[in-house]
Amino acid sequence: MNENTLKEIVRRCYLQYLSREPDDAGLKHYVHLMQTGQINEKSLIDTFKNSPEYKLAHPVEIEPDTPVDIKMKKEWNERAKMNHLFVIATNHSESEEDFWESGITECNAILGKGTNRFQNIIKNKEPSKMNVLEIGCGIGRILIPMRKIFGNMTGIDISSEMVRLGQKYVTNIPNCSIVENNGIDLSEFPDNYFDFCFSFIVFQHIPEKKIVEKYISEVSRVLKPNCLFRFQVRGTIASKPNQITTWDGVQFASDEIHKIAQANNFEIIEEGNDKDEYYWLTFRLNSINSSSRIQK
């Protein structure tokens, strides 16, 4: 086969198994291996399917027609078993010390300690009496340091394995709990219960927009009027994955977010750049009866 044909084979394998275009170095490397007879297309596929990159996106074999909530739960359980520190905080997984220190940093950044955001979060409330919810808490990296600020912290996670690991850290902390949820709603919580909700590096892994939208709708139900929801989604970054998975999830543009906010009785009081991977938003729930929300 000529070089162009080999390049196309390598490119096709990258797109199918790694969900991205090949970088120049990778393309040259695998074309050279095929030209010299060291690998063929089958062994190239095997190489990709055994790579850490592929296993993050596809940690376990699942039937194509598996419901998305079951798929998310199974795949995140497997990721937690592989390396829970890495899949929670990829850039802070070299040591447990770095991992937990990063949680303190992220806690302060989310709350905006020393800024107007923090004042808006605790407005007219005593922090020691506030109920706070984290969506997608993992093993409690951010939840645990935040419990020093607020009266009661609840973290939910779709992965029973993450919950099992996390409960070891919160067992003796009376105002902090980690519970498993179904990954698609907040049905275990009553209306108007929380004083603040937040989520970080969670919605970016969800493979369907309707699930993210459902979570936002559910937050508008469980959050008290005039309280805040601080969260992050994946913006419309240039390096969009070729295949949406439970690792490389959906992206949102600003106009979509504004429509979702309006439909769920939220006012956007902070908005980051929707072209960033970490597209941050702060919503405030308007103080009208929840039954007045636009039904979707």
Where are these regions (language model features)?
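Substrate/cofactor-recognition hotspot
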Residues: 1-61
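Active-site acidic short loop of glycosyltransferases
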Residues: 173, 191-192, 225
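A short acidic, Gly/Pro-enriched loop at the edge of an enzyme's catalytic core
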Residues: 187-197
